[in-house]
Amino acid sequence: MTKFPEGRQASAVIPLLWRAQEQEGWLTRPAIEAVADLLGMAYIRVLEVATFYFMFQLQPVGQIAHFQICGTTTCMICGAEDLVSVCKEKISSKPHVISEDGKFSWEEVECLGACANAPMVQIGKDYYEYLTAEKFADLIDQLAAGEVPTPGSQTGRYAAEPATGLTSLQDHEAGKAAFNASVQLAVDLGDTVKRIDGSEVPLLTPWLGKGAKSKAAPKAKVKAAAKTKTAKAKAAK
């Protein structure tokens, strides 16, 4: 919040929601309300943000991973439907339904901006690119076994460079990292799947009291809460 000018703290709503979601894998009603209170925003305003972006989940997801499969043009042409079929076979026949063992869930989303390495799947903050049905099925099996597959291209391709390597602009080749920037950071931190199930370094989560149970918040109730809060504020004046 200190990154934003005085009076503009509400600009931190997206990163705060993202950090809140990392605690339980999805945004519970108490989490949304805690972010709203922290920023001095009406509950409904924070809920509006949470419902606008598909990176935010408003219902429970798999304990290990929630797969977001890009379903727009480039990925579909390159085989995204095969990835969806893998999810239906190994996780559940419908999106947003948690697997029987509680480990996984999935959904199809709009373009994730990795068209050069299509098809791809996002898990939390990480991209797994250049997938085939076989590679994706193996990736799920690795996660189920407690392993953490390296994000990025699953064929060894560096970022979006030619699969056979550069034929020009080779001056920067010497000494470059093994992976492109975002993948290298995730690998260096060892921070990939951990940030989905909330097992990374604990943050302050005032809405997670001892023995507290997470409950989904019907939109109507959140709206009512916002109205009640506004009415109380007016009465106080």
Segments the model singles out, each with a brief description of its role:
Residues M1-K237:
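Signature of N-terminal electron-transfer/Fe-S-associated modules in redox systems
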